Curated annotation (Swiss-Prot):
Protein localization: Membrane
Gene name tied to this protein: DES1
Taxonomic source organism: Sorghum bicolor (Sorghum)
Name used for this protein in its record: Probable fatty acid desaturase DES1
GO cellular component, as recorded: membrane
Membrane-spanning ranges: 62-82, 85-105, 119-139, 177-194, 226-246, 248-268
Histidine box-2 (motif): residue ranges: 143-147
Length: 388
Protein backbone atom coordinates (compact mmCIF):
# COMPACT_ATOMS: atom_id res chain seq x y z
CA UNK A 1 0.00 0.00 0.00
CA UNK A 2 1.47 3.37 -1.04
CA UNK A 3 2.17 6.01 1.56
CA UNK A 4 0.36 9.25 0.79
CA UNK A 5 1.18 12.69 2.20
CA UNK A 6 -2.08 12.52 4.15
CA UNK A 7 -1.01 9.20 5.74
CA UNK A 8 2.28 10.74 6.84
CA UNK A 9 0.49 13.73 8.31
CA UNK A 10 -1.96 11.49 10.18
CA UNK A 11 0.91 9.41 11.56
CA UNK A 12 2.78 12.50 12.69
CA UNK A 13 -0.40 13.85 14.28
CA UNK A 14 -0.92 10.59 16.17
CA UNK A 15 2.67 10.72 17.42
CA UNK A 16 2.21 14.32 18.51
CA UNK A 17 -0.98 13.45 20.39
CA UNK A 18 0.71 10.48 22.05
CA UNK A 19 3.67 12.63 23.06
CA UNK A 20 1.34 15.31 24.42
CA UNK A 21 -0.44 12.70 26.50
CA UNK A 22 2.87 11.41 27.85
CA UNK A 23 3.98 14.96 28.67
CA UNK A 24 0.66 15.63 30.39
CA UNK A 25 1.00 12.40 32.34
CA UNK A 26 4.55 13.36 33.31
CA UNK A 27 3.37 16.77 34.50
CA UNK A 28 0.65 15.12 36.55
CA UNK A 29 3.25 12.86 38.17
CA UNK A 30 5.48 15.82 38.92
CA UNK A 31 2.50 17.80 40.25
CA UNK A 32 1.55 15.14 42.79
CA UNK A 33 1.91 16.55 46.28
CA UNK A 34 2.50 13.83 48.87
CA UNK A 35 1.88 16.41 51.60
CA UNK A 36 -1.81 16.76 50.75
CA UNK A 37 -4.30 14.79 52.88
CA UNK A 38 -4.92 11.39 51.28
CA UNK A 39 -8.39 10.59 49.90
CA UNK A 40 -8.61 7.46 52.07
CA UNK A 41 -8.70 6.70 55.78
CA UNK A 42 -6.50 4.35 57.73
CA UNK A 43 -9.54 2.10 58.14
CA UNK A 44 -9.66 1.73 54.35
CA UNK A 45 -6.05 0.55 54.32
CA UNK A 46 -6.68 -1.84 57.18
CA UNK A 47 -9.72 -3.31 55.46
CA UNK A 48 -7.59 -4.13 52.39
CA UNK A 49 -5.18 -6.28 54.42
CA UNK A 50 -6.25 -9.97 54.46
CA UNK A 51 -7.42 -11.10 57.87
CA UNK A 52 -4.85 -13.89 58.16
CA UNK A 53 -2.04 -11.32 57.90
CA UNK A 54 -2.88 -10.24 61.44
CA UNK A 55 -2.41 -13.73 62.85
CA UNK A 56 0.70 -14.20 65.01
CA UNK A 57 2.18 -17.66 65.29
CA UNK A 58 4.58 -17.99 68.24
CA UNK A 59 5.94 -21.23 66.81
CA UNK A 60 6.69 -19.65 63.47
CA UNK A 61 8.30 -16.68 65.18
CA UNK A 62 10.41 -18.98 67.35
CA UNK A 63 11.49 -20.88 64.25
CA UNK A 64 13.06 -17.70 62.90
CA UNK A 65 14.87 -17.22 66.21
CA UNK A 66 16.22 -20.78 66.11
CA UNK A 67 17.27 -20.32 62.48
CA UNK A 68 19.15 -17.10 63.19
CA UNK A 69 20.78 -18.39 66.39
CA UNK A 70 21.96 -21.50 64.53
CA UNK A 71 23.44 -19.30 61.80
CA UNK A 72 25.28 -17.10 64.32
CA UNK A 73 26.69 -20.13 66.17
CA UNK A 74 27.75 -21.83 62.93
CA UNK A 75 29.44 -18.70 61.60
CA UNK A 76 31.29 -18.10 64.86
CA UNK A 77 32.41 -21.72 65.12
CA UNK A 78 33.65 -21.80 61.53
CA UNK A 79 35.50 -18.49 61.78
CA UNK A 80 37.21 -19.46 65.05
CA UNK A 81 38.25 -22.82 63.60
CA UNK A 82 39.72 -21.34 60.41
CA UNK A 83 41.20 -18.27 62.12
CA UNK A 84 42.40 -16.86 58.81
CA UNK A 85 42.75 -13.21 57.87
CA UNK A 86 41.34 -14.15 54.48
CA UNK A 87 38.15 -15.30 56.22
CA UNK A 88 37.73 -12.72 58.97
CA UNK A 89 36.44 -9.82 56.79
CA UNK A 90 33.80 -12.09 55.26
CA UNK A 91 32.83 -13.29 58.73
CA UNK A 92 32.49 -9.73 60.03
CA UNK A 93 30.18 -8.74 57.18
CA UNK A 94 28.00 -11.86 57.35
CA UNK A 95 27.89 -12.15 61.14
CA UNK A 96 27.14 -8.44 61.48
CA UNK A 97 24.20 -8.95 59.14
CA UNK A 98 22.97 -11.78 61.35
CA UNK A 99 23.28 -9.54 64.42
CA UNK A 100 21.06 -7.14 62.49
CA UNK A 101 18.58 -9.99 61.94
CA UNK A 102 18.61 -10.55 65.72
CA UNK A 103 17.72 -6.90 66.15
CA UNK A 104 14.73 -7.13 63.81
CA UNK A 105 13.28 -10.13 65.67
CA UNK A 106 13.76 -8.35 69.00
CA UNK A 107 12.15 -5.29 67.45
CA UNK A 108 9.13 -7.46 66.60
CA UNK A 109 8.99 -8.59 70.23
CA UNK A 110 8.84 -4.94 71.26
CA UNK A 111 5.90 -4.29 68.95
CA UNK A 112 4.06 -7.39 70.10
CA UNK A 113 4.03 -8.77 66.56
CA UNK A 114 6.21 -11.70 67.64
CA UNK A 115 3.38 -13.30 69.61
CA UNK A 116 0.35 -12.45 71.72
CA UNK A 117 2.24 -13.42 74.89
CA UNK A 118 3.84 -10.44 76.63
CA UNK A 119 5.99 -12.84 78.66
CA UNK A 120 7.32 -14.63 75.58
CA UNK A 121 7.93 -11.33 73.82
CA UNK A 122 9.84 -9.98 76.81
CA UNK A 123 12.00 -13.09 77.30
CA UNK A 124 12.94 -13.44 73.63
CA UNK A 125 13.34 -9.69 73.20
CA UNK A 126 15.71 -9.47 76.18
CA UNK A 127 17.80 -12.42 74.98
CA UNK A 128 18.17 -11.08 71.44
CA UNK A 129 18.65 -7.41 72.22
CA UNK A 130 20.90 -7.89 75.23
CA UNK A 131 23.20 -10.01 73.07
CA UNK A 132 23.71 -7.04 70.74
CA UNK A 133 23.98 -4.56 73.63
CA UNK A 134 20.57 -2.95 73.39
CA UNK A 135 18.48 -2.31 76.53
CA UNK A 136 15.29 -4.03 75.37
CA UNK A 137 12.62 -2.07 77.23
CA UNK A 138 14.47 1.23 77.01
CA UNK A 139 14.68 1.00 73.24
CA UNK A 140 11.20 -0.53 72.93
CA UNK A 141 9.66 2.47 74.66
CA UNK A 142 11.53 5.07 72.61
CA UNK A 143 10.69 3.16 69.43
CA UNK A 144 7.03 3.18 70.44
CA UNK A 145 7.32 6.98 70.65
CA UNK A 146 8.76 6.97 67.14
CA UNK A 147 5.83 5.01 65.75
CA UNK A 148 3.21 7.05 67.58
CA UNK A 149 4.69 10.29 66.21
CA UNK A 150 6.17 9.25 62.88
CA UNK A 151 6.55 12.14 60.46
CA UNK A 152 6.13 14.82 63.16
CA UNK A 153 8.91 17.41 63.11
CA UNK A 154 8.94 17.98 66.86
CA UNK A 155 7.76 14.71 68.37
CA UNK A 156 9.31 11.98 66.20
CA UNK A 157 12.14 10.07 67.83
CA UNK A 158 14.27 8.49 65.08
CA UNK A 159 16.13 10.50 62.45
CA UNK A 160 13.72 13.40 62.83
CA UNK A 161 14.72 16.56 60.93
CA UNK A 162 16.59 19.46 62.48
CA UNK A 163 14.89 22.83 62.18
CA UNK A 164 16.77 25.58 60.36
CA UNK A 165 17.28 27.65 63.50
CA UNK A 166 18.74 24.70 65.37
CA UNK A 167 20.83 23.71 62.35
CA UNK A 168 22.38 27.19 62.07
CA UNK A 169 23.41 27.00 65.72
CA UNK A 170 25.16 23.65 65.35
CA UNK A 171 28.96 23.85 65.43
CA UNK A 172 30.68 22.85 62.16
CA UNK A 173 31.94 19.61 63.67
CA UNK A 174 28.42 18.50 64.61
CA UNK A 175 27.19 19.19 61.08
CA UNK A 176 30.05 17.19 59.64
CA UNK A 177 29.35 14.22 61.90
CA UNK A 178 25.66 14.20 61.00
CA UNK A 179 26.01 14.72 57.25
CA UNK A 180 29.33 13.17 56.22
CA UNK A 181 29.79 9.42 55.68
CA UNK A 182 30.56 7.20 57.51
CA UNK A 183 29.72 9.10 60.70
CA UNK A 184 25.90 8.86 60.38
CA UNK A 185 26.25 5.08 60.22
CA UNK A 186 27.95 4.92 63.62
CA UNK A 187 25.56 6.99 65.72
CA UNK A 188 23.27 4.35 67.21
CA UNK A 189 25.31 3.61 70.38
CA UNK A 190 25.50 7.36 71.04
CA UNK A 191 21.75 7.61 70.54
CA UNK A 192 21.20 4.94 73.20
CA UNK A 193 23.21 6.96 75.69
CA UNK A 194 22.40 10.56 74.72
CA UNK A 195 19.46 10.53 72.23
CA UNK A 196 19.80 13.45 69.82
CA UNK A 197 19.69 17.23 69.29
CA UNK A 198 17.21 18.96 71.60
CA UNK A 199 16.11 15.57 73.00
CA UNK A 200 18.02 14.91 76.23
CA UNK A 201 17.83 11.58 77.97
CA UNK A 202 19.22 8.07 77.97
CA UNK A 203 17.80 4.61 77.30
CA UNK A 204 19.46 3.18 80.41
CA UNK A 205 18.18 5.18 83.39
CA UNK A 206 14.56 5.10 84.61
CA UNK A 207 14.83 8.81 85.43
CA UNK A 208 15.17 9.64 81.72
CA UNK A 209 12.54 11.84 80.07
CA UNK A 210 11.80 8.91 77.78
CA UNK A 211 10.03 6.94 80.48
CA UNK A 212 7.01 7.24 82.72
CA UNK A 213 7.22 6.28 86.43
CA UNK A 214 5.35 3.01 85.81
CA UNK A 215 8.05 1.93 83.34
CA UNK A 216 10.87 2.22 85.89
CA UNK A 217 11.01 -1.51 86.67
CA UNK A 218 11.11 -2.50 83.00
CA UNK A 219 13.95 -0.09 82.28
CA UNK A 220 16.01 -1.29 85.24
CA UNK A 221 15.53 -4.94 84.19
CA UNK A 222 16.76 -4.25 80.66
CA UNK A 223 19.71 -2.19 81.85
CA UNK A 224 20.68 -5.04 84.18
CA UNK A 225 20.60 -7.51 81.27
CA UNK A 226 22.71 -5.09 79.23
CA UNK A 227 25.27 -4.89 82.04
CA UNK A 228 25.41 -8.70 82.27
CA UNK A 229 26.19 -8.93 78.56
CA UNK A 230 28.86 -6.26 78.81
CA UNK A 231 30.41 -8.03 81.81
CA UNK A 232 30.39 -11.29 79.84
CA UNK A 233 32.31 -9.65 77.00
CA UNK A 234 34.85 -8.25 79.45
CA UNK A 235 35.24 -11.68 81.06
CA UNK A 236 35.80 -13.29 77.65
CA UNK A 237 38.37 -10.62 76.85
CA UNK A 238 40.27 -11.60 79.98
CA UNK A 239 39.97 -15.31 79.18
CA UNK A 240 40.68 -15.30 75.43
CA UNK A 241 42.24 -11.90 74.83
CA UNK A 242 40.64 -8.64 73.67
CA UNK A 243 41.74 -9.20 70.05
CA UNK A 244 39.80 -12.45 69.82
CA UNK A 245 36.66 -10.83 71.25
CA UNK A 246 37.10 -7.93 68.85
CA UNK A 247 37.30 -10.32 65.90
CA UNK A 248 34.49 -12.59 67.04
CA UNK A 249 32.08 -9.97 68.38
CA UNK A 250 33.29 -6.36 68.19
CA UNK A 251 33.60 -5.95 64.44
CA UNK A 252 30.36 -7.82 63.63
CA UNK A 253 28.70 -5.51 66.16
CA UNK A 254 30.06 -2.53 64.22
CA UNK A 255 28.59 -3.93 60.99
CA UNK A 256 25.26 -4.40 62.77
CA UNK A 257 25.27 -0.77 63.92
CA UNK A 258 25.91 0.37 60.36
CA UNK A 259 23.04 -1.77 59.10
CA UNK A 260 20.68 -0.34 61.70
CA UNK A 261 21.59 3.29 61.02
CA UNK A 262 21.52 2.82 57.24
CA UNK A 263 18.15 1.08 57.13
CA UNK A 264 16.52 3.45 59.61
CA UNK A 265 17.76 6.44 57.64
CA UNK A 266 16.70 5.09 54.25
CA UNK A 267 13.16 4.39 55.43
CA UNK A 268 12.66 8.04 56.37
CA UNK A 269 14.73 9.87 53.73
CA UNK A 270 15.42 9.89 50.04
CA UNK A 271 17.53 12.00 47.70
CA UNK A 272 14.77 12.27 45.09
CA UNK A 273 11.61 11.44 47.05
CA UNK A 274 9.92 14.63 48.26
CA UNK A 275 8.92 13.48 51.73
CA UNK A 276 6.77 15.82 53.82
CA UNK A 277 7.11 16.38 57.56
CA UNK A 278 4.27 17.74 59.65
CA UNK A 279 3.41 19.92 62.61
CA UNK A 280 0.25 20.96 64.37
CA UNK A 281 -3.13 20.04 62.96
CA UNK A 282 -1.66 18.93 59.63
CA UNK A 283 -0.14 15.87 61.31
CA UNK A 284 -2.12 12.69 61.69
CA UNK A 285 -1.08 9.11 62.34
CA UNK A 286 -1.97 8.16 58.76
CA UNK A 287 -0.21 11.08 57.08
CA UNK A 288 2.86 10.59 59.25
CA UNK A 289 3.01 6.89 58.40
CA UNK A 290 2.80 7.67 54.69
CA UNK A 291 6.06 9.64 54.89
CA UNK A 292 7.98 6.37 55.29
CA UNK A 293 9.63 4.67 52.31
CA UNK A 294 9.84 1.01 51.36
CA UNK A 295 13.26 -0.25 50.24
CA UNK A 296 14.41 -3.37 48.44
CA UNK A 297 17.49 -5.15 49.81
CA UNK A 298 17.71 -7.99 47.31
CA UNK A 299 18.26 -11.42 48.78
CA UNK A 300 18.95 -9.82 52.17
CA UNK A 301 15.21 -9.10 52.42
CA UNK A 302 14.59 -12.55 53.85
CA UNK A 303 17.67 -12.49 56.08
CA UNK A 304 16.53 -9.37 57.88
CA UNK A 305 12.88 -10.42 57.91
CA UNK A 306 11.43 -8.10 55.25
CA UNK A 307 12.08 -4.95 57.25
CA UNK A 308 12.08 -3.11 53.90
CA UNK A 309 8.27 -3.27 53.78
CA UNK A 310 8.23 -0.27 56.05
CA UNK A 311 5.08 1.66 55.13
CA UNK A 312 2.66 -1.06 56.19
CA UNK A 313 4.83 -1.84 59.21
CA UNK A 314 4.60 1.77 60.35
CA UNK A 315 0.86 1.95 59.86
CA UNK A 316 0.20 -1.45 61.45
CA UNK A 317 3.17 -2.57 63.61
CA UNK A 318 1.13 -5.50 64.94
CA UNK A 319 1.44 -7.37 61.62
CA UNK A 320 4.12 -10.12 61.89
CA UNK A 321 7.10 -9.68 59.59
CA UNK A 322 6.29 -12.85 57.63
CA UNK A 323 2.99 -11.28 56.48
CA UNK A 324 4.30 -7.81 55.60
CA UNK A 325 4.96 -8.47 51.91
CA UNK A 326 1.47 -9.85 51.34
CA UNK A 327 -0.10 -7.05 53.37
CA UNK A 328 1.80 -4.46 51.35
CA UNK A 329 0.62 -5.92 48.04
CA UNK A 330 -2.96 -5.90 49.27
CA UNK A 331 -2.79 -2.29 50.49
CA UNK A 332 -1.08 -0.76 47.44
CA UNK A 333 -4.30 -0.24 45.41
CA UNK A 334 -5.70 1.81 48.31
CA UNK A 335 -2.49 3.75 48.92
CA UNK A 336 -2.14 4.65 45.25
CA UNK A 337 0.33 7.46 44.61
CA UNK A 338 1.03 7.76 48.33
CA UNK A 339 2.98 4.51 48.08
CA UNK A 340 6.46 4.89 46.57
CA UNK A 341 7.48 1.76 44.71
CA UNK A 342 11.00 0.77 45.87
CA UNK A 343 13.82 0.62 43.35
CA UNK A 344 14.97 -2.95 42.78
CA UNK A 345 18.44 -3.57 44.19
CA UNK A 346 19.52 -6.80 42.54
CA UNK A 347 21.17 -9.51 44.66
CA UNK A 348 22.90 -6.98 46.93
CA UNK A 349 21.50 -3.58 47.99
CA UNK A 350 24.51 -1.65 46.69
CA UNK A 351 22.37 1.02 44.93
CA UNK A 352 20.99 2.01 48.32
CA UNK A 353 24.44 3.18 49.38
CA UNK A 354 24.25 5.72 46.57
CA UNK A 355 20.78 6.77 47.72
CA UNK A 356 22.12 7.28 51.23
CA UNK A 357 25.17 9.26 50.13
CA UNK A 358 23.14 11.55 47.88
CA UNK A 359 20.49 12.01 50.54
CA UNK A 360 22.85 13.21 53.26
CA UNK A 361 24.08 15.83 50.79
CA UNK A 362 20.64 17.37 50.27
CA UNK A 363 18.47 16.58 53.32
CA UNK A 364 19.86 18.93 55.95
CA UNK A 365 17.09 20.85 57.73
CA UNK A 366 13.45 21.92 57.58
CA UNK A 367 11.90 25.33 58.05
CA UNK A 368 11.19 26.64 61.54
CA UNK A 369 7.70 27.58 60.39
CA UNK A 370 4.85 25.86 58.60
CA UNK A 371 2.79 22.79 59.33
CA UNK A 372 3.88 20.95 56.16
CA UNK A 373 7.61 21.23 55.52
CA UNK A 374 10.25 19.55 53.38
CA UNK A 375 13.98 19.07 53.71
CA UNK A 376 16.18 21.89 52.47
CA UNK A 377 19.85 21.91 51.50
CA UNK A 378 22.76 23.84 52.96
CA UNK A 379 24.85 24.29 49.82
CA UNK A 380 27.61 25.94 51.82
CA UNK A 381 28.06 22.71 53.81
CA UNK A 382 28.56 20.76 50.59
CA UNK A 383 31.06 23.31 49.28
CA UNK A 384 32.99 23.19 52.56
CA UNK A 385 33.07 19.39 52.49
CA UNK A 386 34.44 19.40 48.94
CA UNK A 387 37.22 21.82 49.90
CA UNK A 388 38.25 19.57 52.78
Amino acid sequence: MATTPMTVVDHEAEEAVAKAREDDKSRQVDAFDAGKPPPFRIGDVRAAVPEHCWHKSPWRSLWYVVRDVAAVVALGTAAAAMDSWAVWPVYWAVQGTMFWAFFVLGHDCGHGSFSDSRTLNSVVGHLLHSFILIPYHGWRISHRTHHQNHGHVDRDESWHPITEGRYRRLPPRAKKIRFTAPYPLLLFPLYLFYRGPDKPGTHFLPSSELFSPKEKGDVMLSTTCWCIMLASLLAMSCAFGPLQVLKMYGLPYLVFVMWLDLVTYLHHHGHHERLPWYRGEEWSYLRGGLTTVDRDYGWINKIHHDIGTHVIHHLFPQIPHYHLVEATKAAKPVLGRYYREPQKSGPLPLPLLGVFLRSIRVNHFVSDHGDVVYYQTDHHLNDTTKQK
